[in-house]
C-alpha cells in the first residue's frame, strides 16, 4: 500500500489522510518484481515463456538476464529479437500484463553479476557456487531486454 497525502480542509490547519493507491501493472511493478517471464519466438512461429532472474540496467527500461549459452532462449533470441516480458512468480505464473520488448545478446561483465548478487543475495551465491563447481560459469550468456516505448 502506498500512502498519498490528501488535504482535508484548507481553512484550518492542513490535515493529511492515508489514502491507499492501487498501482496499475506498470514498469514500476515490473522493475520491483523478483522474476519476470521472458516470452521469445521460435522458428515455427510459436512462443515460449520462461521465468528468469533479472536486474535493472543503467539505461532506462532496460534489464539484464543471464542464461546458459546453449539454452533455448539464447538460440531463439539469436534468431528473433522480438520478445515480451511480464511480471511472474518463481514457477512462471504470469502476474501482470505483457509488455513488448527487444532482446539482444551482450557481453557479460562483473558489474552485472555484482548486481545479481546484490538483488538475489544468498540464493544467487549458492547458484553461482554450484555453477563454478560444475564448470557452467564459462557457458553463460548475458541478455539485454529493453522494454519498447508505449
Task: Give residue ranges: language-model regions.
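Charge-dense, helix-prone N-terminal extensions
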Residues: 21-38, 59-61, 124, 145-150
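Short, P/G- and charge-enriched loop/turn segments at secondary-structure junctions
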Residues: 24-26, 40-41, 129-133
Amino acid at each position: 500500500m502506498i500512502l498519498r497525502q490528501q488535504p482535508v480542509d484548507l481553512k484550518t490547519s492542513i490535515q493529511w489522510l492515508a489514502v491507499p493507491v492501487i498501482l496499475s501493472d506498470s514498469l514500476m511493478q515490473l522493475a520491483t518484481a523478483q522474476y519476470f517471464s521472458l516470452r521469445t519466438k521460435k522458428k515455427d512461429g510459436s512462443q515460449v515463456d520462461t521465468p528468469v532472474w533479472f536486474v535493472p540496467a543503467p539505461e532506462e527500461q532496460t534489464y539484464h538476464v543471464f542464461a546458459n549459452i546453449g539454452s533455448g532462449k539464447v538460440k531463439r533470441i539469436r534468431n528473433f529479437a522480438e520478445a515480451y516480458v511480464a511480471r511472474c512468480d518463481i514457477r512462471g505464473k504470469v502476474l501482470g500484463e505483457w509488455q513488448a520488448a527487444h532482446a539482444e545478446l551482450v557481453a557479460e561483465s562483473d558489474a552485472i553479476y555484482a548486481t545479481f548478487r546484490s538483488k538475489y543475495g544468498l540464493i544467487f551465491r549458492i547458484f553461482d557456487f554450484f555453477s563454478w563447481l560444475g564448470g557452467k560459469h564459462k557457458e553463460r550468456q548475458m541478455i539485454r531486454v529493453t522494454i519498447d516505448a508505449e
